[in-house]
Amino acid sequence: MSGHSKWATIKRKKAATDQKRGNLFTKLVKEITIAAKMGGADPGGNPRLRLAIDTARSNSMPMENILRAVKKGTGELEGVTYDEITYEGYGPAGIALIIETATDNRNRTVADIRHIMSRNNGSLGESGSVSWMFHRKGSLDVSKSAVSEDMLLEILLDAGLEDLESDDAIYYTVITDLKDLETVKKALDAAAIPFENARIDMIPENYIELEAEDASKVIRIIDALENNDDVQAVYSNMEISEKAMNSLNE
């Protein structure tokens, strides 16, 4: 919707101002370790690992850190065993939240998540309480300065494009089925069109639009969750009007 920011756009704008590289590296190392443990050390045959390594490299993680994380995942080096647990619940203004974690201590993590939620006018729900509102997809961002919308559609329609969001002023958000994400990346590479932030996303079926006051409360709870080392990703169905987004940035 023109003049509105969906959650992918809001996250991108938040990331531009967040200074959490150490925290980000911790999360990336966990993802690489888990991906290598589940699918092996060869990125060519392990799409999740390939995506995790690409993300780490795009965030300037040293290669030695990446290789060490892979070896911990495969057992070549001793490392921590992580469990992946997804929590669901509601934030302020009834916004649905999905919280993906990787932890070596389930009790600590659930206590921390519950504490963060309750302190910020949120509540944890049962498994399945909000996940039915979302679909797991692949997505990436393409700068609008690199290609027209018509050309991008022409390039990607046969590569697995499901949706193209253009509500952001700077980027298109390309949405695909997870199995088609690599094909879409290759199609963009072949057309010499740069892209950023290829990722696994949870896309809501419908968005809830918030004004600045409620949006700031939701962003506050998401920030608190993302600052927890056990939290890998947070997804929401929040949408903010451009006017409200601008007031938040003032």
Swiss-Prot record:
UniProt cross-references to Pfam families, sorted A to Z: TACO1_YebC_N, Transcrip_reg
UniProt main location, coarse: cytoplasm
Any one cellular-component term (Gene Ontology): cytosol
Subcellular location: Cytoplasm
Keyword Lyase assigned: no
InterPro entries: Integrase-like_N, TACO1_YebC-like_2nd/3rd_dom, TACO1_YebC_N, Transcrip_reg_TACO1-like, Transcrip_reg_TACO1-like_dom3, YebC-like
NCBIfam families on file: PRK00110.1 (NF001030), PRK12378.1 (NF009044), YebC/PmpR family DNA-binding transcriptional regulator (TIGR01033)
Family: Belongs to the TACO1 family.
Name of the protein in its database record: Probable transcriptional regulatory protein Cpha266_0538
Organism of provenance: Chlorobium phaeobacteroides (strain DSM 266 / SMG 266 / 2430)
Lineage: Bacteria, Pseudomonadati, Chlorobiota, Chlorobiia, Chlorobiales
